[in-house]
Amino acid sequence: LVGSEMCIRDRDCEIACVISNHDDLRSMVEWHGIPYYHVPVNPQDKEPAFAEVSRLVKQHEADVVVLARYMQILPPELCSEYAGRVINIHHSFLPSFVGAKPYHQASLRGVKLIGATCHYVTEELDAGPIIEQDVVRVSHSDSIEDMVRFGRDVEKMVLARGLRYHLEDRVLVHGNKTVVF
C-alpha cells in the first residue's frame, strides 16, 4: 500500500473506492475516507458479484480498476467492457507461473528468481500486455513463506510503478505488447 500511496500522492487523481471480496482492510480504507464495499464472490454463482462490481465501478466513475489480492478471473464481458482500464498485479515474473500459488510452483521448480508483473487484464488468464515487472533473487534454502514475504515487497513496487505509468499515459499498447515511455 505504501508504494501505491506514493504513486497516487503525486498524481492528479483520487481513489474512487475500494471494492473487495475480503473484508479485512475495511477499517484502514475507511480511516482514509475512501468508500469501501465488500462484495463476496460465491464460487457456485459468481455473476451477481461481478454485476455488483461493475455497477459500483460505474457509480463511482472510476477511470481505472486495480486488481490486488482479488484472485478471481473476470468474465469476458467485464474484460471487454473495461479493456485497457483494468490492471492486475500477479505474483510471478510472467509468463512463468500463471494462475494460483505461483510461489509454490516456483519452489517446486527450484527457481533462482521470483518476481511480480503488473499487466492489463484480458480474457486470457495472466496473459495481458505487461506494464511493469521486477525480480528478487531466492535460494534453495528459502521456504515458500520466505518467497511470499520477499515477493510482497516486489509486488508493491511493481504495482506502484505500473499504475503510475498508466496514470501518466506513458503506456502504449500494441497487440499484446507494451512500450512504456
Regions found by a protein language model. Give the residues of each.
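Short, small-residue-biased leader/transition segments that mark boundaries at the very start
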Residues: 1-2, 6-8
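Short, conserved loop/helix-junction motifs that constitute active-site signature segments
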Residues: 9-12, 80-82
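Short internal beta-strands
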Residues: 12-24
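Short hydrophobic/aromatic-enriched beta-strand-loop microsegments
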Residues: 13-16, 36-40, 85-90
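Donor/substrate-binding cores of folate-linked one-carbon enzymes
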Residues: 21-22, 32, 49, 63-181
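Acyltransferase donor/substrate-recognition loop-hinge adjacent to the catalytic core
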Residues: 27
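Adenosine-nucleotide cofactor-binding segment
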Residues: 30-62
